[in-house]
Amino acid sequence: MFSLPLHQSKLIFLLSFLLIKTLNAQPTYLLSYCYTSGNYTPNSSYKSNLDTLISVLDSQSSNKGFYSYASGSSPTTTVYGSYLCRGDISSSTCETCISRASKNVFIWCPVQKEAIIWYEECFLRYSSRKIFSILDQGPFVTWTSYDTTLYQFYFINTVEYRMDRLIQEAYSSSSYFAEETYHVSYLGEVYDLNGLVQCTPDLNQYDCYRCLKSAYNETKDCCYGKRFALVYSSNCMLTYKATFLAPPPPPPPPPPPPPPPQRLYGENDTPSSDESFSFKLGKVFRRIIAPVIAAVVIILVISVCSLCCCCIKKKKKANQREASIEIPTLNTGENLTVDHQ
């Protein structure tokens, strides 16, 4: 059997580990949006300023979670851009995400003057108009899951309450960021509800609140009742996810069919009116009518027997009288009696 030397096996294992770690560290691409406000030509000043902007943003991603920059001196060729990384990721993950976004945005939007690219870990945008400290009511990117929780009404109410608290916490803080893990246990369904909200730091408090509320309202259209929801705009991020800690319980069995109607009743049972009448009639028959009928039958039998006896006796006496007949003689004065007995 072929086997590798020990040092080669260790090297292969190390390379495999690094490859898996690298693949797992790759940012998750969501969507790109190319605005229709205008295009630039490849060799224009706008293109040159755009390249400078992207280079600066990429270089700052190693130590900053948010950065904005403007490249150019002429109002017609100046490019404004910024990026935002999620507050719960490491600086290396942020750097990887912005580096990937700065390259791929030109693949999806090769000539547009304004574009935005979203990853789950970050987003990057640029424009020919001023975008700093301005709430953009532009497009949203939404992601959701197909699966739901067993008790949706309770889940929806819990999500709404917890996300509202997170939004208040985020726009009230200096970082415009808030996250939490809320443990839920309801009728055997146990899960952790992880929530995260974040705004770009250049917004004021009111605009941060408006952005996050608009993002949450988007979840009611795309993700209502779903275990996972993600809504990003060009100024804020909002996401939540329910992670089950135990398999959800099976749905309760359907109720058993109703028992068939009972025909026998105890002392305290109350039958229906028709059945009660029949039941009472049977009791009356057994207690009163049946003995009366039996007595009548006995009397009739005795009467018939007595009548038969009387008839037999009368018939017998009649036969005896007919048998005793007087026969007169012709010549003598004596009577002859004939007895047939």
UniProtKB/Swiss-Prot annotation:
Listed InterPro entries: CR_prot_dom_plant, GNK2, GNK2_sf
Annotated ranges, domain Gnk2-homologous: 28-131, 136-245
Keywords, alphabetical: Disulfide bond, Repeat, Secreted, Signal
Subcellular location: Secreted
Region (Disordered) location: 247-274
Disulfide bond sites: C85-C94, C97-C122, C199-C208, C211-C236
Stated family: Belongs to the cysteine-rich repeat secretory protein family.
Protein name: Cysteine-rich repeat secretory protein 1
Organism whose genome encodes this protein: Arabidopsis thaliana (Mouse-ear cress)
